[in-house]
């Protein structure tokens, strides 16, 4: 009986360790941009996403081409599921205008962006960092600089 007891303890310990290693999914909200033209497109996308395991709520805004999914899901899996419907999809590339400290960076304004949104840009986020290098182009054309370009 001693061998069976030790074997059963070994097996139970093995399964206990594998249970602890399982990655728990976290509750998150995934925003995806999907081109939708009609009620059928909207219904098809909503049904495809709502049938996924772990989805708590699905909101579709056809006016700004946005699908918001809340639940215990991974963004890549939601994106793949929407692409299976035949629609082109991408992670929501915009942020609200008032959330960006300096939205005047190159590439942030997009004609296709919904009203009140600007495109996410890495350049505008880099300017917010305290140790970010600054460009001193203005000092090149000052009167105190003897090497500055002058037109007489």
Curated annotation (Swiss-Prot):
List the InterPro entries hit by this protein, alphabetically.
HMA_dom, HMA_dom_sf
Sorted alphabetically, the keyword list is: Cadmium, Lipoprotein, Membrane, Metal-binding, Methylation, Prenylation
One GO cellular component from the entry?
membrane
Task: Give me the residues that bind Cd(2+), please.
Answer: 38, 41
Q: Which Pfam families does the protein's record reference? A: HMA
Its annotated compartments are:
Membrane
The lipid of kind S-farnesyl cysteine is covalently joined to: 149
Which ranges does the record mark as transmembrane? none
Q: GO terms for biological process? A: detoxification of cadmium ion
Reported consequences of knocking out the gene: No visible phenotype. Hipp20, hipp21 and hipp22 triple mutants are cadmium sensitive.
| A Gene Ontology molecular function term of the record | metal ion binding
Note the superkingdom of the native organism.
Answer: Eukaryota
Q: Where is the HMA domain?
A: 27-90
Query: Pro-sequence positions in this chain?
Result: 150-152
Question: Where does tissue-level expression of this protein occur?
Answer: Expressed in roots, shoot apical meristem, leaves and flowers.
Q: Any idea which residues bear Cysteine methyl ester here?
A: 149
PANTHER family documented for this protein: COPPER TRANSPORT PROTEIN ATOX1-RELATED, HEAVY METAL-ASSOCIATED ISOPRENYLATED PLANT PROTEIN 20
Q: How does it assemble?
A: Interacts with ZHD11/HB29.
Family membership noted in the UniProt record: Belongs to the HIPP family.
Protein name from the UniProt record = Heavy metal-associated isoprenylated plant protein 20
* Species assigned in the record: Arabidopsis thaliana (Mouse-ear cress)
